[in-house]
Amino acid sequence: MTGQGQSAAGSAAWSAVFRHVRYENLVAGVSGGVLSNLALHPLDLVKIRFAVSDGLEVRPKYKGILHCLATIWKVDGLRGLYQGVTPNVWGAGLSWGLYFFFYNAIKSYKTEGRAEQLEPLEYLVSAAEAGAMTLCITNPLWVTKTRLMLQYGGVASPSQRQYKGMFDALVKIYKYEGVRGLYKGFVPGLFGTSHGALQFMAYELLKLKYNKHINRLPEAQLSTAEYISVAALSKIFAVAATYPYQVVRARLQDQHVSYGGVTDVITKTWRKEGIGGFYKGIAPNLIRVTPACCITFVVYENVSHFLYDLREKKVS
């Protein structure tokens, strides 16, 4: 097939995918992402602080989760615990909204005209594709979030509090580091789509298996408690498999240290800290992401079903 023919075939495939988009998925995903991140942002801050804790004198030393929270509260108060909340909420809301938006469109495209459910690998690939598309749009927000979270209160140099807020950070990163600065951590972020892919695959399969086990239709709506259980199990599975990339990504995005790239981060982390360095911050991360995932998925499922019901009532 010629390049022109391949391009036309690719365009036709994407057009077919976008025929399946439903804005209910976007709205429901944004709702879930925003609510969960507002509720649990301080734990995300702790996770980032621990992830980049590599022994440098420029950083405060924390003895544990509670000590970290107490130190931030003592130095900066409630505002300190919500450092970086604006890009985090924007990023999480947009990411979850786009993820559900793209994922459901891709999944609907692949199941069109099929009687049977997707295979596990098809769920995995669909979620990975949705994750890559989402990351291309949202990576600058994650860089900004990390930079804002790593402005330590009480440190000596004023330059370490160089950003006034999300938009100021976006402008300054672009001004001094260009587009490349806004896309720091993009490569490990792409590897990180495996996290979402594994989570969505596990989530879909657990829902299907559970409904089959209790003799319900495969796509039957679950109760809130059932959604929480399925979401928690799928999240724990995904975190256990993919956490090290988050440490690598956070260190690449850290303004206090300059690394030569992904390989340089991995080499230096392994040499100085061993395998434990790749799992720094996993405890506060699990404590945060498991309930955050449960909130996100419960809100998403209920809001999306509500909006779909509204659409059906309008049609009828």
Swiss-Prot record:
Keywords: Membrane, Mitochondrion, Mitochondrion inner membrane, Repeat, Transmembrane, Transmembrane helix, Transport
Transport listed as a keyword: yes
Pfam families according to UniProt: Mito_carr (PF00153)
The organism's taxonomic lineage, starting at the top: Eukaryota, Metazoa, Chordata, Craniata, Vertebrata
Protein name in the entry: Solute carrier family 25 member 32
GO MF annotation list: FAD transmembrane transporter activity; folic acid transmembrane transporter activity
GO CC annotation terms, alphabetical: mitochondrial inner membrane; mitochondrion
Membrane topology: Multi-pass membrane protein
Protein purpose: Facilitates flavin adenine dinucleotide (FAD) translocation across the mitochondrial inner membrane into the mitochondrial matrix where it acts as a redox cofactor to assist flavoenzyme activities in fundamental metabolic processes including fatty acid beta-oxidation, amino acid and choline metabolism as well as mitochondrial electron transportation. In particular, provides FAD to DLD dehydrogenase of the glycine cleavage system, part of mitochondrial one-carbon metabolic pathway involved in neural tube closure in early embryogenesis.
InterPro entries: Mitochondrial_sb/sol_carrier, Mt_carrier_dom_sf, SLC25A32-like
Solcar repeats: 20-109, 118-209, 222-306
GO terms under biological process: folate import into mitochondrion; mitochondrial FAD transmembrane transport
Disruption-associated phenotype: Embryonic lethal. At 11.5 dpc, the majority of mutant embryos show neural tube defects with exencephaly or craniorachischisis associated with multiple acyl-CoA dehydrogenase deficiency. Neural tube defects can be prevented by formate supplementation in early embryogenesis.
PROSITE patterns per record: SOLCAR
TM helices/strands, residue ranges: 26-46, 89-106, 123-143, 185-203, 227-243, 281-300
Subcellular location field: Mitochondrion inner membrane
Gene3D superfamilies reported for this sequence: Mitochondrial carrier domain
Protein origin, superkingdom: Eukaryota
